[in-house]
A protein has these predicted regions:
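Hydrophobic membrane-insertion alpha-helices, especially the h-region
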Residues: 8-24
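Short beta-strand segments enriched in small/hydrophobic residues
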Residues: 25-54, 134-135, 161-170
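Extracytoplasmic "Venus flytrap"
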Residues: 39-56, 61, 70-81, 103-105
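Periplasmic-binding protein-like
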Residues: 91-102, 120-124, 162-166, 192-193, ...
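Flexible loop/hinge segments that line or gate small-molecule binding clefts
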Residues: 107-143, 254-262
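Venus flytrap/periplasmic-binding-protein-like
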Residues: 122, 225-226, 237-267, 304-309
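Hydrophobic alpha-helical segments within soluble ligand-binding/sensing domains
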Residues: 136-161, 253-257, 273-290
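Hinge/cleft segment of the Venus flytrap/periplasmic-binding protein
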Residues: 276-323
């Protein structure tokens, strides 16, 4: 090999090494740094007991979109003022988007208009889209109530009163569910009674009254997941109560409730895809923060589930989502 060939060969090697070093230090090919989207999820409960599947979907979207999601619970149950304070705090701390499960939909919308958050809000509930709310993700509560009413009218005795249990009619979606149930039960000749939670033992006292001779049996409907969960736990703990509460229906699904449905404590419930709800909320928050989103309203489809349907596995993917 001549000296000229050796020099050319060495120069080629040095050039390749130089190009490699330059590219690896981003001096030639600079990788575009992806900004992390900070998302605050503020829910309407003091814990995440009713958000298992929602969080699974949320976590999957967080990984896919490389977001930083902060899941925030309330310190006091159904405290709308505290929820407002948390929204303000998260905005001041630099959240790029907020996902809000409102305690009270009407108050939340008014407060958002007052606060003027300056970042997109994904609203978990059926609200009108305005300057504060970028997207709403909801399920038709009236339709769920109407479906439960139909199932009761099809299989239950109109001579047995129906008690509707609620954490509070002012809370998001409960009035719609109430109207839906009564739209069927009233024409069908059922006697309907509303029981709103006033204290920790409201539901238990109402059920205890059934064991007295002067009080008759009744059917129970939990109009929200909190009411349904508490009613199911009370009935599961007492065979005497189950003799007088002839059937339990409700809205909402958790792993515990599905197990109670399988054991016959709950006769039927309305469920929807909470995994998709969690995933979509983060996805839309990331898109809205980047100014890239199309859907303004997303409506999830509810399904009626009883023991037979549960065991058939038709809705297994929806009820028991896996990543």
């Amino acid at each position: 090999m001549s000296n000229r060939e050796k020099i050319s060969w060495c120069a080629g090697v040095l050039l390749l090494v130089a190009l490699y070093l330059l590219s690896s230090t981003d001096l030639i090919i600079k990788e575009k740094k992806r900004e992390i989207c900070r998302i605050s999820v503020i829910i309407d409960n003091v814990n995440d007991n009713y958000y298992g599947s929602f969080r699974a979907g949320m976590d999957m979207a967080e990984k896919k979109y490389q977001a930083d999601v902060n899941f925030i619970t309330l310190y006091a149950e159904n405290d709308e003022e505290q929820q407002e304070e948390l929204i303000v705090r998260e905005i001041k701390d630099g959240a790029n988007a907020i996902i809000l499960a409102p305690v009270r939909e009407d108050l939340a919308v008014m407060k958002l208009d007052e606060i003027s958050p300056g970042c997109p809000v994904i609203f978990l509930g059926p609200t009108a889209i305005n300057s504060s709310v970028a997207c709403s993700i909801s399920v038709d509560r009236y339709e769920m109530g109407r479906t439960i009413g139909e199932k009761i009218a099809e299989s239950e005795d109109p001579a047995v009163p129906v008690c509707l249990f609620s954490e509070g009619m002012a809370y998001t979606g409960n009035l719609d569910a109430y109207d839906g149930i009564r739209s069927v039960l009233d024409p069908a000749g059922f006697t309907v009674r509303l029981i709103e939670k006033k204290s920790e033992d409201t539901y238990r006292k109402a059920i205890e009254e059934t064991v007295y001779p002067e009080s008759g049996d009744f059917m129970a409907v939990g109009m929200d997941v909190g009411a349904l969960s508490e009613l199911a736990d009370i009935l599961e703990g007492s065979s005497v109560y189950r003799e007088h509460v002839t059937a339990l229906y409700g809205i909402g699904s958790t792993t515990v409730l599905l197990n109670q449905l399988d054991r016959g404590i709950v006769k039927g419930l309305m469920a929807w895809n909470r995994f998709d709800e969690g995933y979509l909320s983060v996805e839309k928050a990331v898109q809205a923060a980047g100014g890239e989103w199309k859907e303004k309203r997303i409506t999830l489809t509810p399904e009626y589930i009883d023991g037979e349907i549960l065991r058939s596995g038709i809705f297994e993917k929806m009820l028991y989502p896996m990543e």
